[in-house]
Every structure is written in C-alpha cells, then in structure tokens.
Amino acid sequence: AMDYATPAEQIIQASPRHRARKLMTTMSEKGFSHIPVREEGAIRGVFSISSVFDYVRRYPDRGLTEDTRVADFAEFLPVENHGERFLFAGPELTYWEAREAFGQVYKHRRLAVIFLTEDGSKTGRLLGMLTPWDVLGLDEEITAEEMVQPAQ
C-alpha cells in the first residue's frame, strides 16, 4: 500500500498552534480534506471539514477569526470524535487490505484515511497517508488504460 500512499514529506500537517483559517485556505487550494494534527511526534487528531462544521454548529457565536487556532477545535480533532473513521496501519499493509478496508462501512461511518506509521500506531512515525481515491480510483484508471490499448 505504501506504493500508492502520499509520502509523509508531502503531507500537509498541522499543530495545535496553527491558524485555522490559513490551514483551511491551504486545504481548499490543494484539494485536501483531512490534515493530521501532530504534537510531540504523534498524531493527536485530524483537522477536517467535519471538524469545522462540528465546531461552528456547537459554537455558533464564536465564529472563525484570524486568531482562531487549530487548538480551538480540540474536542473535535481526536479520531474517536469524528463522524468518519481513521485507521492506523504499519507499512506492511497491502493494497488489497487497504482496498477492502475502504470498501467497508462500520456503524454507518466510512473510512476516510489510512495513516501508515512505522509501527501501525498513532504514536508511530508517520510514513504516509492513503485516501479512498488513492486506492479505489486505481480501478477506473486501469480500466481506462485497458480500453485504449490497441487490439493485439
């Protein structure tokens, strides 16, 4: 699965002190929907569209100012508090295991991201990140390539 993952050095990562609106602008410009929030080397949570939505819904009077930090979303960042699911796996995860994981729905929650870490835990060193598009989108690409191959 590592062959299909976005390598850690190419993943936008945040810390609790990052400005939320600036991060949201970057996410929008780059087309990212989930940003790992790291502190002391470990993934402490995920900043996402649903984090922002939950924050605004819970605290409608606070708004999002230039001074709003990722830390202000603290209660909505832990992977356990998301409406989506996140999986942590080691580098030995295969493409087919990742594909199967993305195809499953658990308690009405879809798998949004697989974080590949050195030891398969959220405290392990981040190696890469897989999204459903990284894995499930390959079938369409392969089919499209096969369709344009000249007949033998």
Residue ranges and their predicted role:
Residues 1-10, 48-111, 131-152:
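Tandem CBS (Bateman) regulatory domains
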Residues 5-8, 14-17, 21:
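The feature marks the first
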Residues 10-13, 42, 88, 125:
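Short, flexible active-site loop motifs that bind/organize anionic cofactors or intermediates
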Residues 19-22, 26, 97-101:
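Well-ordered alpha-helical segments embedded in enzymatic catalytic cores
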Residues 27, 35-52, 102, 106, ...:
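A glycine-centered beta-loop-beta connector
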